[in-house]
């Protein structure tokens, strides 16, 4: 069973320095049909203008993954972490008992395009933490690359939840498959380009909630970048 979340039905807004689209209810945008899916709570697609950014703000009890599609994003937090997130990097911040951070576009000429993902943790009160790893394009080209998991398998960043996040880059006509255990669920997000998901056409920004499907076949209709979540 698949339920499509069309890109043009997402919430969001344009604030000059920030253009954002919300797959699920977030801040002032609320849709009772789209409050999240399983442990997946937020997928925000953001475009941050040159020299724009989010000032220091708090989070609690959330696993936050930032995935940059183009440009670069500067991160600073109350743990003393300072880093720049580049395209293809996987960054995980465990908010746990509480963390404060800021995010900014350090470029004076180029916007940064990113996905920010929130996953509910397996329990409250985790120790706050930060992890960032690079996942080269070659490792994602034509195949799924695991970038986040509960046990840090295959060099992925570690999250406090029974969930996995895969990414693939596909050329037009290229196809990948992924199998799921009967009790698992999946969410697919088209970050760039277009694909056919088990024959269903999806475009950039579209998502799909998937249950009771043992196998997914994703075929690119154009150059595409796709995120796939395996969820309990």
Would you name each region that the model predicts?
Residues 1-232:
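Jelly-roll (double-stranded beta-helix
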């Amino acid at each position: 069973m698949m339920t499509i979340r069309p890109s043009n039905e997402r919430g969001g807004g344009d604030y000059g320095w920030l253009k954002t689209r919300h797959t699920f209810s977030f801040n002032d945008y609320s849709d009772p049909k789209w409050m999240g899916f399983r442990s997946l709570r937020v997928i925000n697609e953001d475009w941050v203008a040159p020299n724009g950014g989010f000032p220091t703000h708090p989070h609690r009890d959330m696993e936050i993954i930032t995935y940059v599609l183009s440009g670069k994003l500067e991160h600073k937090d109350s743990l003393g972490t300072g880093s720049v997130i580049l395209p293809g990097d996987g960054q995980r911040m465990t908010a746990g008992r509480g963390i404060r951070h800021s995010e900014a576009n350090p470029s004076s000429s180029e916007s940064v395009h990113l996905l920010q993902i929130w996953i509910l943790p397996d329990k409250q009160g985790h120790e706050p933490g930060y992890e960032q790893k690079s996942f080269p394009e070659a490792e994602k080209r034509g195949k799924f690359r695991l970038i986040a998991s509960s046990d840090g398998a295959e060099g992925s960043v570690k999250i406090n939840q029974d969930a996995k996040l895969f990414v693939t880059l596909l050329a037009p006509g290229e196809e990948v498959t992924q199998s799921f255990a009967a009790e698992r669920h999946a969410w697919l997000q088209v970050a760039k380009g277009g694909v056919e998901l088990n024959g269903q056409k999806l475009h950039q920004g579209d998502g799909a909630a998937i249950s009771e499907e043992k196998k997914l076949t994703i075929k690119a209709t154009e150059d595409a970048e796709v995120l796939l979540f395996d969820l309990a």
